[in-house]
């Protein structure tokens, strides 16, 4: 089973393997998805820069991919990782650190 990239980018929810905590949300195109499969490290597509980026390439806070899941419509991806260091560029463990309710 493969993701359906016919409509473009797919959301990729990244979660920590042990805790299942949501670390971040990013987007993948088909090339980022294939590079993620090949390298077992996360690759995403930057909508603002319009280019691929490898999580942790600059910071060293890499994500080692343990498994990938597709939703029932094959248009969203869950990436289960072992995170090295914080996931958020702000230095927080997760990008979802602002509690609303």
From Swiss-Prot:
Cofactors named for this entry: Mg(2+); Zn(2+)
Binding residues for Zn(2+): 72, 88, 95
Classification via Pfam families: PRA-CH (PF01502)
Protein's UniProt keywords contain Cytoplasm: yes
UniProt pathway annotation: Amino-acid biosynthesis; L-histidine biosynthesis; L-histidine from 5-phospho-alpha-D-ribose 1-diphosphate: step 3/9
The keyword Phosphoprotein is assigned to this record: no
Molecular function GO labels: magnesium ion binding; phosphoribosyl-AMP cyclohydrolase activity; zinc ion binding
Function: Catalyzes the hydrolysis of the adenine ring of phosphoribosyl-AMP.
Protein's name according to its UniProt entry: Phosphoribosyl-AMP cyclohydrolase
Provenance organism: Bacillus cereus (strain ZK / E33L)
Designated gene of the protein: hisI
